[in-house]
Each structure stands twice: as C-alpha cells, then as structure tokens.
A protein has these predicted regions:
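Residue-level detector of well-ordered alpha-helical segments, enriched
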Residues: 22, 26, 49, 68, ...
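Short, compact, well-ordered microdomains
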Residues: 71-106
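Core of compact, soluble alpha-helical bundle domains
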Residues: 2-63
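Absolute protein N-terminus
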Residues: 1-2, 106
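Short amphipathic alpha-helical segments and their helix-coil junctions
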Residues: 4-13, 65-82
Length: 106
C-alpha cells in the first residue's frame, strides 16, 4: 500500500481524529489523478470545478444531490478558505464529514 501519510497530515489540519481508512478510500478513488498537481487540488473560486465535485464525488460516491451537495461544498470551501492550495483528498474528506456521509468511505 502507498504511503498516504502526507494526506493524513493535511486532513489533520482541518479535522480531528482522522479516519485513515476513509483517507485511503479517497486516495484510491482519485487514483492516478493525484499525480497531476492541477488535478490534485480543488479551486473554490471556479464554479465549473465545484460543479465537477458536486456531480462526481458528492453525487456518485457520497450520494448527495442538489442543495445538500452545494451546501456541504460551500461549507468546506469556507472551512478551507485560508489554504490557497486545497488538497482534493482533504476537500473530499471534509465534504464527507460535513455531509454526515463518512460511512460511504469507511
């Protein structure tokens, strides 16, 4: 298994008691995309990017739809606003935590 400690550390900056199994599941879900700097980050200022997060991970993996997904995404953007480079893994973890759908990951 790959060393995901960098992701655990980043998630730990925003969430207490990190569920490493959930982080591992997100890393596996994202797969090879995490190798690309651009694809490994989420831009909260780009509505197209947030739409992809909503229609992809939030909908397909977490089962969120419509307003519930949009509210959770907005809450995560607010929580991470001081971090200029928002890690996709951390963003997805916080999205699951915010929406109460962590069980879909671990």
């Amino acid at each position: 298994m790959a060393d995901n400690s960098q992701y655990y550390d980043d998630v730990d900056k925003f969430a207490g008691n990190v569920n490493n199994t959930a982080v591992d599941a997100i890393v596996k879900y994202c797969g090879i995309a995490l190798r690309s700097k651009d694809a490994s980050l989420v831009s909260c200022s780009d509505p197209v990017e947030l739409g992809r997060v909503r229609d992809g991970f939030a909908s397909k993996k977490l089962g969120l739809a419509g307003d519930a997904a949009d509210k959770a995404i907005a809450a995560v953007c607010e929580k991470m606003k001081d971090d200029r480079q928002k890690s996709r893994v951390t963003f997805y973890y916080l999205l699951a935590e915010e929406s109460g759908t962590m069980s879909a990951l671990a």
